[in-house]
From Swiss-Prot:
Coiled coil: none
Cofactor list: [4Fe-4S] cluster; [2Fe-2S] cluster
Gene symbol of the encoding locus: bioB
Name of the protein described by the UniProt record: Biotin synthase
Reactions that this protein is recorded to catalyse: (4R,5S)-dethiobiotin + (sulfur carrier)-SH + 2 reduced [2Fe-2S]-[ferredoxin] + 2 S-adenosyl-L-methionine = (sulfur carrier)-H + biotin + 2 5'-deoxyadenosine + 2 L-methionine + 2 oxidized [2Fe-2S]-[ferredoxin]
Binding locations of [4Fe-4S] cluster: 65, 69, 72
Any one biological process term the GO annotation gives: biotin biosynthetic process
Quaternary structure and partners: Homodimer.
Length: 358
């Protein structure tokens, strides 16, 4: 019975015809493994290969954010002990990007010498991108700043940083700079930059996670970016007390906006944030491994032609089951996050190589 239904929903997804009722039915009646299998078949029908696109970020401006997002350690309303600093210089941003390339080079050398333990699979070399004699496993580099928006001087510095990165590396550049106006978006379009602006939650649930800016503020930026033919990366953060229905609603809202890439973040509660206190007090129930995997699979089923990438909270929430998500993912964020530590690139590459060898 499940097999027949999988074939039915496979055909429907490939035609981009999955609706809300379908998605809710799948969540309620299919196991996480069954949903992953369905999403895996969808991904393989669409893509000629299963290469996982890796991206990394720099926290280019940290803390002192006047917004009150309940999950964020950079908000002035949180009590977190995090690094606080103004916008890094263009040279500092460039050097950070170069460190990522250097790390790829060192890993490549270790593979060639046979000293990278656990990387016996030849697929590890295959999942990279050609780059001056060695694979560049990290495809994208995103410049992220705290705050609702950046000022004109900060924007100029970031533009110059992007120009340097493009001149001196093969990295594709993304920017997460808050609420950008049309003129700034037009400048970024000239630089072939992908814009990042998370919805964070569904339209109906957004009021529960932030009051200092609106869901509509974010949608306005995304729509303006799409009008200018910019690529847009937009997703959300899950595990903030939202219902399954709200998670599914956001998928359809993102689909309607026509975003190109959808990052899935799962709450990693940080002591000092409002979300942490809500979990501690029992107001929010942490997301389970099964629910997280169902969510990832459903987003691929609902949006088969968008890039689904796993970002913040994957280590904390999926633990030993991260590799299961690789069945359906198009992308993965590697390295450190904004204020939390990630895994080293080498460990993630080993995980990907092991998956590709199955």
């Amino acid at each position: 019975m499940i097999f027949m239904e999988i074939e039915t929903f496979l055909k429907k997804s490939l035609k981009n015809k999955i609706d809300f009722d379908d998605a809710l039915y799948l969540y309620n009646n299919f196991s996480a493994i069954d949903l992953l299998y369905l999403a895996f078949k969808i991904k393989n029908r669409i893509k000629n290969n299963s290469k996982i696109k890796l991206c990394a970020i720099i926290n280019a401006k940290s803390g002192k954010c006047k917004e009150d997002c309940i999950f964020c350690s950079q908000s002035i309303y949180s009590k977190c002990n995090i690094p606080i600093y103004p916008l890094k210089s263009k040279k500092e941003i460039l050097e950070y990007a170069k460190k990522i390339i250097d790390e790829c080079s060192k890993i490549s050398s270790s593979i060639e010498r046979g000293t990278l333990i656990g990387a016996e699979s030849p697929n590890l070399m295959d999942v990279g991108y050609p780059n001056r004699g060695f694979p560049l496993w990290v495809e994208r580099f995103s410049i992220v700043t705290s705050g609702k928006k950046i000022n004109d001087d900060e924007f100029i510095e970031i533009v110059e940083a992007i120009e340097l990165i493009k001149e001196e590396t093969n990295l594709k550049v993304c920017c997460s700079l808050g609420l950008l106006d049309r003129e700034k978006l037009k400048e970024l379009k000239k630089l072939d930059v992908r814009i990042h602006n998370n919805l964070e939650a569904s339209k109906n649930y957004f009021k529960n996670i932030c009051s200092t800016h609106s869901y509509e503020d974010k949608v306005k930026v995304i729509k303006e970016a799409k009008k200018l033919d910019l690529e847009v990366c937009s997703g959300g953060i899950f595990g903030l007390g939202e219902s399954v229905e709200e998670r599914i609603k956001m998928a359809f809202e993102l689909k309607e906006l026509g975003v190109d890439s959808v990052p899935i973040n799962i709450l990693h509660p940080i002591e000092g944030t409002k979300a942490y206190e809500k979990i501690k007090n029992g107001e929010i129930k942490p997301i389970s491994v099964s629910d997280a995997l169902k969510l990832i699979a459903l987003y691929k089923i609902i949006m088969p032609y968008a890039e689904i990438r796993l970002a913040g909270g994957r280590i904390y929430n999926l633990r030993d089951f991260q590799s299961y998500a690789l069945m359906v993912l198009d992308g993965l964020m590697v390295g450190n996050y904004l204020t939390t530590k990630g895994r080293c690139l080498e460990d993630d590459l080993k995980m990907i190589a092991d998956f590709h060898s199955l």
